[in-house]
Swiss-Prot record:
The keyword Nucleotide-binding applies. InterPro entries: P-loop_NTPase, Small_GTP-bd, Small_GTPase, Small_GTPase_Rho. The lineage of its organism: Eukaryota, Amoebozoa, Evosea, Eumycetozoa, Dictyostelia. It comes from Dictyostelium discoideum. It comes from the Eukaryota. This is Rho-related protein rac1C. GO terms for biological process: actin filament organization; cortical cytoskeleton organization; establishment or maintenance of cell polarity; mitotic cytokinesis; regulation of actin cytoskeleton organization; regulation of cell shape; response to bacterium; response to imidacloprid. NCBIfam families: small_GTP. A motif (Effector region) lies at residues 32-40. The gene is rac1C.
Length: 193
């Protein structure tokens, strides 16, 4: 059985722990308790291959900026998460999380994950954001951010309804077992005759 280490990063309160608990236990946790570090494990079949998926939950809070990278060595794939209803967490994907991951693990695939997709159409949430002249992050914005940080894929999910949840982890595994073919840069230069 192939073992894959998947580390989940992103701002505090974007839903990283809920994502992992909902995926591994099929239950949505009730209250928010900030994570320092937690590990989860799941044995799954993807494309007919048995996989032991080691899931590393990290703290998004700035207090842990020096501690968090200790979980990065030997990572096979990163999930960089932002909340669809938190534009600031979306901006931090390229402002903080992408650069942090690239610095510590430059050649490891990244899946960009928009969490809380069930809240995008929630009227109360929309009104709260509008009061601050903000809007939920669109799917198209997610695709743009994926290209900006050179992620393998952009996916959205809801830990509450489990919509898109299994796909996130299946695609994370696929990014490791079927890595994307790197485009070789053609060498342009001049020929001296």
């Amino acid at each position: 059985m192939q073992a894959i280490k998947c580390v989940v990063v992103g701002d505090g309160a974007v839903g990283k722990t809920c994502l992992l608990i909902s995926y591994t236990t099929n239950a949505f946790p009730g209250e928010y308790i900030p994570t320092v570090f937690d590990n989860y494990s799941a044995n799954v079949m993807v494309d007919g291959k048995p996989i032991n998926l080691g899931l590393w939950d990290t703290a998004g809070q700035e207090d842990y900026d020096r501690l968090r990278p200790l979980s990065y060595p030997q990572t096979d794939v990163f999930l960089i998460c932002f909340s669809i209803i938190s534009p600031s967490s979306y901006e931090n994907v390229s402002g903080k999380w992408g650069p942090e991951v690239f610095h510590h693990a430059p050649n490891v695939p990244i899946i960009l994950v928009g969490t809380k997709m069930d809240m995008r159409e929630d009227k109360e949430t929309q009104d709260r954001l509008k009061e601050k002249k903000l809007y939920p992050v669109s799917y198209e914005q997610g695709l743009l951010k994926m290209k900006e940080i050179n992620a393998f894929k952009y996916l959205e999910c809801s830990a509450l309804t489990q919509k898109g949840l299994k796909t996130v982890f299946d695609e994370a595994i696929r990014s490791v077992i079927n890595p994307p073919v790197k485009k070789s840069k053609s060498k342009s230069g001049c020929n001296i005759l």
